[in-house]
């Protein structure tokens, strides 16, 4: 449902002159009216012409097109964001297809690697282990009092790039940009945070420009005590905030999620957001290929926290579709670098133990090896769906894809690893190896594939289709927790907007131009489920929709009135 157009009320602010021009959330630049220029001591500080935001956005678009590399475009957009946030979001929303890969994946990966080199202006909060005893003071220094969404990272597992130390701050900044651009959450309500606990990246430690704490990463009790201090300080400062964990290492991601998801409204996008968008994609792809997800056999390459999180949510969804838990688990096969996860495999991680196959059930498999490779698994399972979350390029070989297609006329193949350089196989190859029959969704953006004069659009299985709507739904409903059922309702709603399902052609996921509409629909479904689950106060459907509309921020300038501090 589109939000009703409502007249924006005037905003009363105490700032004036150069201070106002340096305030990104309030700066209008050349769009300040003549009356505002007189009232806020801006006469002579700006060119004569008063422009509209669209005129400003057109100039910015022309300037943007003058940059030749993606990282230079990223730097330019970040500069606008740090100068005039309203203009930044108007520009991004005008060109979302072009700019989303620049402000987030894959370009944000390079921005994280070069964070200290391209650093220009502070954004967000940097909390180093050295300052752990000043946690409350640090959060009190945040000028925005009504923070509603925090994205926090410790920089240890940035995309597929590993430990980027303080450079990981690029991820919370980019993620929150999408909360606003796609989910309509006001930038005034968002806060990016990096927990600087050191780095084990020797290249960063040797870099004279590196801006983080030059120390090996703290671990074990020291690490968990530090994170706990942060969580308690956040609860004290903003008790109703939504906290998103982002790009934590596998060894910490699941323990932190399990420890805090029932203590503070929180979720891990790498685990739960990735799972939700993947399940939504699979529901739609299964319907397009014929049948339900519960009828499909699924093989994973990659059994880390993200892969296992997706697998568990698939199992939950197939149970909703009528399978028993035992039957649902028998349809999911997890392969890591040591082969298929079985009950005879040593040193399994806690979250892997429920996803093993019983070795005794594999006695009739066609294989000569004790280690069951991906090819062995594909040959014997004959899967309908192949999902890659390995972070390693090229592992979906031609032999594996052709073997899958031999037994599955309409295979669903999802190489989800980020960034583009880590993808398990390119869509071009997958389409060619399956004679144009595969349904493909990727983690990074890819151009449409042309094969034998036919165009195949490639859906990006982008978490941005999920987490902004979840955030908006949590804020609008006042949810105190994010439950598994809320995430599954987001997946089901996303699947309902699949052009391939609705029209029989096109992308398996919605186009980016529709992402705000999808986010609002997900917000409603999430808010409604939160009420049903008892983690939000029950209201009428009309009241929930009104709350979503009221909280949906638009990139428009408001009229300013002068007031004293």
Swiss-Prot record:
The record's GO molecular-function terms, alphabetically, read: malate dehydrogenase (decarboxylating) (NAD+) activity; metal ion binding; NAD binding; oxaloacetate decarboxylase activity
Q: Which SUPFAM superfamilies match?
A: Aminoacid dehydrogenase-like, N-terminal domain, NAD(P)-binding Rossmann-fold domains
What is the residue range of the signal peptide feature?
none
Task: Kindly give the InterPro entries that the UniProt entry links to this protein.
Answer: Aminoacid_DH-like_N_sf, Malic_enzyme_CS, Malic_N_dom, Malic_N_dom_sf, Malic_NAD-bd, Malic_OxRdtase, NAD(P)-bd_dom_sf, NAD_malic_enz_proteobac
Q: Which residues bind a divalent metal cation?
A: 246-247, 270
Q: Name one GO cellular component term.
A: cytosol
Tell me its family: Belongs to the malic enzymes family.
The protein's name in its UniProt record: NAD-dependent malic enzyme
UniProt lists the gene as maeA
């Amino acid at each position: 449902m589109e939000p009703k157009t409502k007249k924006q009320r005037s905003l009363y602010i105490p700032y004036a002159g150069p201070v106002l021009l340096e305030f990104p959330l309030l700066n209008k630049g050349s769009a300040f009216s003549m009356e505002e220029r007189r009232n806020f001591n801006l006469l002579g500080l700006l060119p004569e012409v008063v422009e509209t935001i669209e005129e400003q956005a057109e100039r910015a678009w022309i300037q943007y097109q003058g940059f030749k590399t993606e990282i230079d475009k990223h730097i330019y957009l970040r500069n606008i964001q740090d100068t005039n946030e309203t203009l930044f979001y108007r520009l991004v929303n005008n060109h979302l297809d072009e700019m989303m890969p620049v402000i987030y994946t894959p370009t944000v990966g390079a921005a994280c690697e070069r964070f200290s080199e391209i650093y220009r202006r502070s954004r967000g909060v940097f909390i180093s282990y050295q300052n752990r005893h000043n946690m409350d003071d640090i959060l009190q220094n945040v000028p925005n009092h009504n923070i509603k969404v925090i994205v926090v990272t410790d920089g240890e597992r940035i995309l597929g790039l590993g430990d980027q130390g303080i450079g990981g701050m690029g991820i919370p900044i980019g993620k929150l940009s999408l909360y606003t651009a796609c989910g309509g959450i006001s930038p005034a309500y968002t806060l990016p945070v990096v927990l600087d606990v050191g780095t084990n990246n020797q290249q960063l430690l040797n870099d004279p420009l590196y801006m983080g704490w030059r120390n090996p990463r703290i671990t074990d009790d020291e690490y968990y005590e530090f994170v706990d201090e942060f969580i308690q300080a956040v609860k004290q400062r903003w008790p109703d905030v939504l906290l998103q964990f982002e790009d934590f290492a596998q060894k910490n991601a699941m323990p932190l999620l399990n420890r805090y998801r029932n203590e503070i409204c929180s979720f891990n996008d790498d685990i739960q957001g990735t799972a939700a968008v993947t399940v939504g994609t699979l529901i739609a792809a299964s319907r397009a290929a014929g049948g339900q997800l519960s009828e499909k056999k699924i093989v994973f390459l990659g059994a880390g926290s993200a892969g296992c999180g997706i697998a568990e949510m698939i199992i939950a969804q197939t149970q909703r579709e009528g399978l028993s838990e035992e039957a649902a688990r028998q349809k999911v096969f997890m392969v890591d670098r040591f082969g298929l996860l079985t009950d005879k495999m040593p040193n399994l991680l806690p979250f892997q133990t429920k996803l093993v196959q019983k070795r005794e059930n594999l006695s009739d498999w066609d294989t000569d090896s004790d280690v069951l490779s991906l090819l062995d698994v594909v040959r014997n399972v004959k899967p309908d769906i192949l999902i890659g979350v390995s972070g390693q390029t090229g592992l979906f070989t031609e032999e594996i894809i052709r073997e899958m297609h031999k037994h599955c006329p309409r295979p669903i193949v999802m190489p989800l690893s980020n960034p583009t350089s880590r993808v398990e196989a390119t869509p071009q190859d997958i389409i060619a190896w399956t004679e144009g029959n595969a349904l493909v969704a990727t983690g990074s953006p890819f151009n449409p594939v042309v094969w034998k004069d036919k165009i195949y659009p490639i859906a990006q299985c982008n978490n941005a289709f999920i987490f902004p709507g979840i955030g908006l739904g949590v804020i609008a409903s006042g949810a105190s927790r994010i439950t598994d059922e809320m995430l599954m309702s987001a997946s089901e709603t996303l699947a309902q907007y699949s052009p391939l399902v609705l029209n029989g052609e096109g992308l398996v996921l919605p186009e980016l131009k529709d992402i705000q509409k999808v986010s609002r629909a997900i917000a409603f479904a999430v808010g409604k489920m939160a009420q049903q689950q008892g983690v939000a106060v029950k209201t009428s459907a009309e009241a929930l929709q009104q709350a979503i509309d009221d909280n949906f921020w638009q990139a428009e300038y408001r009229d300013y009135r002068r007031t004293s501090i």
